[in-house]
Design a protein with these regions (language model features):
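A short, basic-hydrophobic beta/loop patch
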Residues: 55-106
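Short alpha-helix boundary/capping and kink motifs at helix termini
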Residues: 14-70, 82
Length: 106
């Protein structure tokens, strides 16, 4: 299996990050087999489109919550990487576990 899991919907709380907020998070390598998708449907035209990265962020968005990595945005990029026999993906990772720990200490 390419991903750790496939589900529909986000199990984590809403984070309210804008695209500008996401752009401040540096991308890092994430293994595809550590990701759980938050959508079951992939638009084939987005997967096959050469200019699919023209709009939006170049890097997928992932959210860590309760020690699980969820792929929030960029499923087509992750599948494209898998089709090219890549096991890792560069993505921006929002760690809600870290934010929760900081909030509890404050």
């Amino acid at each position: 299996m390419i991903f750790k899991g496939v589900r529909e919907g986000k199990p984590y709380p809403e984070h309210h990050l804008s695209y500008r907020d996401w752009s401040r998070i540096p991308p890092r390598q994430i293994r595809l087999d550590e990701l759980v998708t938050t959508t079951k449907v992939l638009a084939l035209d987005r997967l096959l489109s050469e200019d699919s990265t023209f709009y939006g962020d170049l890097f997928p968005h992932a959210v860590k919550w309760k020690n699980v990595l969820y792929l929030e945005d960029g499923l087509h990029r992750a599948v494209r990487a898998a089709l090219r026999n890549r096991t890792v993906l560069h993505a921006r990772l929002l760690d809600l576990d870290d934010l929760d720990a900081v909030t509890r200490r404050a």
